[in-house]
């Protein structure tokens, strides 16, 4: 079986994503139970989220606010009138035997999202992906299988209802994507947006963001869609990319060998790097939707819509564009700096403290990010403040210290914090830039190595690095590298 989609083919894939985002509310969508992650099983439930007789749900107003803000951030039209519906199906993790969702009148429709693909040369291409709808719904519980990570092969299954009733927004895209790379980037941009808005943490490992892929393959140029297959169980953006590439190759091979493609739901197996059949795919009629009688319809007042619109922050795409146009950063740099909202905030605070954009970007994307990755930390975990980073950059640009000395100071600043200026003074690391002092040092080094000096003047010019190293050794790295190198070159020529 081919496991990677061919780069060139007479077929094309048609891909759409359904993205579920858990909203970062303190309580569930229709009751006051906590939404905190990691509680003991079945300790965050009540008669409402468990669907006991005689209780009535009440919509959490923050859920509506977050849904509207997400809808506007995705350029959607906000419905003047929407409602909740019951989506009916039987599964052990659904205590009411129906899920409260939205069917024909969702809160937001007809939006779009622009994704940016940066190639290996750092060049960016942009593509607009349509958003069909965004709707609110409640999450189901979680099945825990004994003896296996899924139902097949398990010895028993347990149900944790803590997740039941946690508020979700489901974002349904148009089938505008054609590759696994585009789909993975679309999903990442959704996560960036909900994180910038503060409506979801977008944590895929904890299930706060989940993506289902709908994919079909057709001959290039054909307008009709092929048979649609849904893929589930992808817990990273790279898994989305790989699962789609695999499924494209599988469907192309099936078409070329005459094997029928059935409409079904398939699971991505991370270990085997393949999709496997799970069940036949249901249609909307199978769920027997009907209006939720226990919840009133939703009408968003124009004044409230205007207020929520005014509270939207600068979003990732706008920020990337500003960084490129106003600050002059490359598409690659802007992509890295805007991927994590916390790093974006740190970067902007560093600029506000007076640092140059390019230097701040280099430090953040280089040594600081390397440290964070090695230590599995977030930018919010370090002791180095944005103001201190700006101060460190100022010391380098003023030739008070060299970049090498700054890198040596960084580990202590990251773990203990404090003022770089005070640390440099305390350790006696101020850079030596005085011409007379440097000239004296160079003369001493040349006098101490007459043999190497003769070899240099006989054509072995690479020895300049040796002499430079000797000066740095005598000054413990404090000699101004640029000034030292220039003066050394003149002295060596005699």
Swiss-Prot record:
GO terms for molecular function: asparaginyl-tRNA synthase (glutamine-hydrolyzing) activity; ATP binding; glutaminyl-tRNA synthase (glutamine-hydrolyzing) activity. Residues 475-494 are annotated as: Disordered. It is an enzyme of class 6 (ligase). It catalyses: L-glutamyl-tRNA(Gln) + L-glutamine + ATP + H2O = L-glutaminyl-tRNA(Gln) + L-glutamate + ADP + phosphate + H(+); L-aspartyl-tRNA(Asn) + L-glutamine + ATP + H2O = L-asparaginyl-tRNA(Asn) + L-glutamate + ADP + phosphate + 2 H(+). GO terms for biological process: glutaminyl-tRNAGln biosynthesis via transamidation; translation. InterPro entries: Asn/Gln-tRNA_amidoTrfase_suB/E (IPR017959), Asn/Gln-tRNA_Trfase_suB/E_cat (IPR006075), Asn/Gln_amidotransferase (IPR018027), Asn/Gln_tRNA_amidoTrase-B-like (IPR003789), GatB (IPR004413), GatB_C_1 (IPR042114), GatB_Yqey_C_2 (IPR023168), Gln-tRNA_amidoTrfase_suB_CS (IPR017958). Its EC number is 6.3.5.-. The keyword ATP-binding applies. Keywords: ATP-binding, Ligase, Nucleotide-binding, Protein biosynthesis. Heterotrimer of A, B and C subunits. PANTHER family: GLUTAMYL-TRNA GLN AMIDOTRANSFERASE SUBUNIT B MITOCHONDRIAL AND PROKARYOTIC PET112-RELATED (PTHR11659), GLUTAMYL-TRNA(GLN) AMIDOTRANSFERASE SUBUNIT B, MITOCHONDRIAL (PTHR11659:SF0). HAMAP family: GatB. This is Aspartyl/glutamyl-tRNA(Asn/Gln) amidotransferase subunit B. It comes from Acaryochloris marina (strain MBIC 11017). The gene is gatB.
């Amino acid at each position: 079986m081919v496991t990677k989609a061919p780069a060139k083919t007479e077929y094309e894939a048609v891909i759409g994503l359904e993205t579920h985002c858990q909203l970062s509310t303190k309580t569930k969508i229709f009751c006051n139970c906590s939404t905190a992650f990691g509680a003991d099983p079945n300790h965050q439930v009540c008669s409402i989220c468990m669907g006991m007789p005689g209780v009535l749900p009440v919509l959490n107003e923050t859920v509506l606010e977050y849904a509207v803000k997400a809808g506007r951030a995705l350029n959607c039209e906000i419905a003047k009138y929407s409602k909740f519906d019951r989506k009916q199906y039987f599964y052990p993790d659904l205590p009411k035997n129906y899920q409260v969702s939205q069917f024909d009148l969702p809160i937001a429709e007809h939006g779009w999202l622009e994704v940016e693909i940066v190639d290996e040369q750092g060049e960016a291409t942009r593509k607009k992906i349509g958003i069909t709808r965004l709707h609110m719904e409640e999450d189901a519980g979680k099945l825990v299988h004994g003896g296996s990570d899924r139902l097949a092969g398990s010895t028993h299954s347990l149900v944790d209802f803590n997740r039941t009733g946690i508020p979700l927004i489901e974002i349904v895209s148009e089938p505008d994507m054609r590759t696994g790379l585009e789909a993975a980037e679309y999903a990442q941009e959704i996560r960036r947006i909900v994180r910038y808005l503060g409506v979801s943490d977008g944590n895929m490992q904890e299930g706060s963001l989940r993506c289902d892929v709908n994919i079909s393959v057709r001959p290039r140029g054909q307008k009709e869609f092929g048979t649609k297959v849904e893929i589930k169980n992808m817990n990273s953006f790279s898994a989305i990319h790989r699962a789609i590439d695999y499924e494209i190759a599988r469907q192309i091979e099936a078409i070329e060998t005459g094997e029928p493609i059935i409409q079904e739901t398939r699971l991505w197996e991370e270990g085997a790097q393949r999709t496997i059949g799970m069940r036949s795919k249901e249609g909307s009629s199978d769920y027997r939707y009907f209006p939720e009688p226990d919840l009133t319809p939703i009408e968003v007042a124009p004044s409230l819509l205007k207020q929520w619109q005014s509270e939207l922050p600068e979003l990732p795409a706008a920020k990337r564009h500003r960084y490129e146009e106003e600050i002059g950063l490359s598409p690659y740099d802007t992509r890295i700096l805007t991927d994590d909202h916390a790093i974006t905030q740190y970067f902007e605070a560093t600029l506000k403290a007076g640092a140059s954009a390019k230097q701040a970007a280099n430090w953040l994307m280089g040594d600081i990010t390397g440290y964070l990755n090695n230590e599995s930390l977030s930018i919010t975990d370090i002791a180095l403040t944005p103001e201190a980073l700006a101060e460190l950059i100022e010391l380098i640009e003023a030739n008070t210290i060299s970049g090498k000395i700054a890198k040596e100071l960084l580990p202590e600043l990251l773990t203990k914090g404090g003022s770089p200026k005070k640390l440099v003074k305390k350790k006696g690391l101020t850079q030596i830039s005085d011409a007379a002092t440097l000239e004296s040092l160079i003369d001493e080094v040349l006098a101490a190595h007459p043999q190497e000096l003769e070899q240099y003047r006989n054509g072995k010019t690479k020895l300049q690095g040796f002499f430079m190293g000797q000066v740095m050794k005598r000054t413990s790295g404090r000699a101004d590298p640029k000034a030292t190198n220039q003066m050394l070159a003149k002295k060596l020529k005699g």
